[in-house]
Amino acid sequence: RKNNAYFEKDEHGNRLPYLEAIAITFLPDKQSEFLQFVQGNLDFLNSLDASYKDELLTNDGRLRDTYTESVNMIRGPYLNTEYLGFYLDSKTPEIQSELIRKAINYGFDRQKMMIYLRNGIGNPAHGGFIPIGLQGHDASLGFTYQPDKAKQLVEQFKKESGISNPEITLTTTSNYLSFCEFIQRELEKAGLIINLDVMPEATLRTARSNGKVDMFRSSWVADYLDAENYLSIFYSKNFAPNGSNYFHYKNTQFDSLYNKAF
């Protein structure tokens, strides 16, 4: 409901908010959600789902002519990072290997993935875990697409480990299967076999929290506008299942700097 005592005003001096109330609806089926939107039963969608992206957008991310009169599309940085996570307490040699983890980061083209699987909606995460639009994002961090480097790292792992056909199981949900299949094909070129395991969101969430999956696709959406919200999931005292450090990542220097940031 509207807060009649809210203090802010717009640039013309009109008191905010404009609306009397907002009704929020949660629909588990994304296609049903889009249908409700097209029929005028919903006023706003906050994300783009693969099930209807090609109906709504052209290949280069513009609204199709059918919707230009009825839909106002606003594009901007969204405080959400999609990522691949490694469970570092796994006994799997490939997961334990920094060579393989780096090879995965170098081995697939994030820009191409955004163009073909999201119609250009989204930014390739070349600048680390903190997303564009939030203070702390640094475009010089992270990994760029270097397929030859990825192949070199996989070959180095083979020589050092004696494992001639390295492979990892990547767990995902059906909504993100196309992303994971893209990554699977790209990494096969580098000599790394990626097996895909698809499960329901609730099942994956439980398995991820309890360290039952070696590698998984997930996302992190900011609860508040501070980079600490993203860095907190790497803090060693936040180990899952009691916290959000699903990776069981532990680094003494990181923990020290994280604490000093407060």
Give the residues covered by each predicted segment:
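Aromatic-rich, solvent-exposed beta-strand/loop patch
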Residues: 1-29, 56-80, 148
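Short, well-ordered beta-strand elements
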Residues: 19-25, 165-174, 194-197, 214
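Short helix-initiation/N-cap motifs at beta->coil->alpha
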Residues: 24-35, 50-51, 174-175, 197-206
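Ligand-binding "clamshell"
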Residues: 55-74, 210-212, 226-243
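Alpha-to-beta junction loops
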Residues: 39-48, 62, 186, 192-193, ...
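Periplasmic solute-binding protein
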Residues: 75-92, 97, 105
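Extracytoplasmic/peripheral linker and loop segments enriched in polar/acidic and small residues
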Residues: 68, 102, 114-117, 193-209, ...
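Append "and occasionally in soluble cytosolic enzymes with long acidic Gly/Pro-rich linkers
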Residues: 1, 6-8, 12, 94-185, ...
